[in-house]
Amino acid sequence: MNEKMDVLFGAYIAVKDGKISYIGKTLPEGQPATIVDGTGMVAMPGLVNCHTHLASTVLRSYLDDANHAEALTQQLQKESKMDRRSAKASALLGIAECLRFGVTSVSDLYYYPDATAEALAETGMKGNVALSAYRFIDESEEFDFETDEQCRELVNIKEKWHGYEDGRIRVDGGIYAEYISNHKLWEGIADYCADEGLGMQLHLATTESETEDCLDRTGLSPAELLNCHRLLNVPVTAAGCAALTEEDKAILGKKKATAVVTPCANAKNSLKSAPIASTVKAGINVALGTDGAVEAGNLDMFEVMRQAAYGERVAQCDPAKLPAAAVLMMATVCGARAQGRSEETGMLKEGFDADLILVDFTAPHLMPCHNVITSLVFSAKGGDVALTMVKGKILYQAGRFPTIDLKNVVEEITGYAIPKLLEESK
C-alpha cells in the first residue's frame, strides 16, 4: 500500500537494516538471512493506534456496564492506587495485544509515561507517549514550570525517552482535558512543547455536555479556549472531537491538528462519535484509535476501522461518504502523520521503516476476496494477523512474542497489579 493504494499480487518485499529495501514482482537479489512465506497472506503497513491508554489495560471489563460518568469516576478512583510497577505490567499486556492485532505504533496518553516508554523500549514497538497532566491551579497561586511536579515529569521523560532508538519512541506534551486543568498549566506545557519541538495529546469535545459546560463557564468552546492559551500552537492530536462546533473545526483545520475518532469505545459507552466527513472537509487530519481497553473492551484496530465506516455510512446514508480506502488510510497514513512519522512509516514503500504486518487471507471469513482493500476493512479481524514487524524486527508471529515474556506479564498482572488497584481499595 502506497500513496496510490496500489495492490500487488505475488510480490516480494525485502528488508535490510530495518527498512524496506525492495518491493517488486521479481525475486530480489542476494541471499536473505530470513525468509517468511507469505503465501495466502496480505502484506500491509502496520496499523497506528492514535489514542490509547496502555497502562489501564489491567482494568479491562471492570466497569463495562456503568454509564460514562460513573465509569470515569470509578476508574479515576482505581487509578489513584496505581504505581509504576503495575503501570508497566499493564502496558506490557496492552502492547502484546496491540502487536497481536497488527499495531506497530501507538499514541499513549496516560499516567506513568516513563513506565509505558520503558515497556515500548523493551518490546520493540513504536510509540508517542504523553503524560495525561491534570490539576487546577488557584488563580492566586504562583505557577512555576520548573518546580511544578507534572511539568518536571514531562521534562524528565522528554530528556530520557524522546528520540530513543532513532525516534522509535517519541514524547509529546499532554493534558487530560480542558475541564480538569486550567490555563496556567496549559500555557506552561504549550510553551515547553513549542520550544522543544514536541507534539501535544489531549481529549477534546468528547461529549456535547463537555462543550456546553465550557461555553457556560467561559463563553468559549473547549477548542477556542485551548487555542487562546497556546495549546494549539504545536501539532495537536485531539481524541474525541464528537462535539466540535463549526468554528472549532475551522480552528483545528487552520492549525493542521489531528482529530482521533474512537468509534468502538464511544459506542460501548453510549457516546456519539465525531462526524468524519465534515471533519475531514474542514482540513483536519482524521486518524483512528481504540481508546483504552477499559473504554473499548479490546485494542483491535480492525474493529475500529469497520465501526468507523459503519457509523459514518449510517449517519450519512451514503457509503460513498467514507470508502474503505479512506478508512484504511486513517488507520495508517493519517496516524503516522499525527505522530510526526509520515516520512518513515504508514506505507509500504522502499526506504520507509519496515513496519508491516501479514494478514492471513486463507480463513473462511476472508474467502473469496474480490477486493483486498474492502476485505481488510469489512471482513478482517485482529486475530487474522499472522506477523507483526517493526523496523524490520519480528515482534509477533504465529502466537509467539519474541520480545515479551507473556507468562511473566500475566503473573505480574494477576499477582501484583490487580491486587494493587482493586483489592486494596475495597
Which sequence ranges carry the predicted segments?
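Metal-coordinating catalytic core of metallo-dependent amide/deamination hydrolases
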Residues: A117-A242, E247-K249
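C-terminal active-site-proximal or functional interface alpha/beta core segments in diverse enzymes
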Residues: A238, A243-E246, N266-S273, N298
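Alpha-helical scaffold segments that flank or form the walls of functional sites
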Residues: R60-M125, Q150-Y164, T414-S425
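Active-site microenvironment of metallo-dependent hydrolases
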Residues: M1-A11, K16, T26, A331-K426
